[in-house]
Amino acid sequence: MVTAAMVKELRERTGAGMMECKKALAHTDGDMEKAVAYLRERGLAAAAKKASRVAAEGLVEAYIHGGGRIGVLVEVNCETDFVAKTDDYKALCKDIAMQIAAAKPEYVRREEVPAEQIEKEKEILRNQALNEGKPEKIVDKMVEGRIEKYFKEICLLEQPFIKNPDVTVQQMITEAVAKIGENINVRRFVRFELGEGLAKRQDDFASEVMAEINK
């Protein structure tokens, strides 16, 4: 029987898409090593190797939402100008820009989060746990679990993909790497929201972006 844990392990080992991993495990009767070989034979396990290649071409994608109330610029790199001009790559860049507009990440990846910000958040989470009456001996484990959730909120690549929350943005990009055949890297982004930091009424821009995606 093919389990979700088996599919997850195979995806982590090969970088192949979820459906490809399910098919490979079914084809090999759940034998993990044979499934890895099966994917490699079909060129579906190449994403991890491609990740080490230089990606210096690409696009700067712009997305404006709600009559100019939210604006996003994101630089997404690939290896060749040819791929950067393809419809699949352009669609990927647009999806990433809309993700940023809707989900408000602060960083691309967790390695970019300043150490002092992480320590400050851990202290807040620790105090919250203690105020909830949790035993001090388990507080540290709770903090580690909650800080992982925090990374999933503020780091673009760890966020659930808005079009398919069953996968992260990184997993979505990994699947695109396998399909397109080149390394793809989100280098940087900037997000502007009209009146950000000023006292104003609260707007649910995330829901508005999702409504536009689902049209």
From Swiss-Prot:
CDD domains: UBA_EF-Ts (cd14275)
GO terms for MF: translation elongation factor activity
Principal location listed in the UniProt entry: cytoplasm
Domain of life per record: Bacteria
The keyword Protein biosynthesis is annotated on this UniProt entry: yes
SUPFAM superfamilies assigned: Elongation factor Ts (EF-Ts), dimerisation domain, UBA-like
InterPro entries hit by this protein: EF-Ts_dimer_sf, Transl_elong_EFTs/EF1B, Transl_elong_EFTs/EF1B_dimer, Transl_elong_Ts_CS, UBA-like_sf
Locations listed in the record: Cytoplasm
Entry keyword Protein biosynthesis: yes
Ranges where the record places region Involved in Mg(2+) ion dislocation from EF-Tu: 80-83
GO cellular component annotations of the record: cytoplasm
UniProt entry keywords in alphabetical sequence: Cytoplasm, Elongation factor, Protein biosynthesis
One Pfam family of this chain: EF_TS
Purpose: Associates with the EF-Tu.GDP complex and induces the exchange of GDP to GTP. It remains bound to the aminoacyl-tRNA.EF-Tu.GTP complex up to the GTP hydrolysis stage on the ribosome.
Family: Belongs to the EF-Ts family.
Protein name, entry field: Elongation factor Ts
Organism (species): Heliobacterium modesticaldum (strain ATCC 51547 / Ice1)
